[in-house]
Amino acid sequence: MPPVLLTKRIEFAAAHRYGRPEWGDAKNRAVFGRCYNPPAHGHNYLLELTVSGDIDPTTGMVVNLFDLKRVLLDVIEEFDHKNLNLDMPYFKDRIPTSENFAHVLWTKLAAQRDIGALHTLRLC
């Protein structure tokens, strides 16, 4: 039997602002548009994590979805209702774009145990 994919979704909120400190206001506005507006702007994010694996013949599961949800909640708790620029050390030296944020989340989730093999992370 081929591996099975399971996806869990979770919602959370966070704020951020794009900008490069070495650029002036004009260049930041030209490159980042409204995402440069001070002090920040917020998003209601939807994180979808897809894991893959073989079905365990004893449990009938690839992963216990309660465990997967708990891990997602634990990881997201650090970011929920935070200003990514000001509150998160991950973005001290990089812009908190959706791409960079997804990379940080992937790295944190990849370090978790017992949630199957990470397949896809989607940040909406």
Where are these regions (language model features)?
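Charge-rich, low-complexity N-terminal segments
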Residues: 1-124
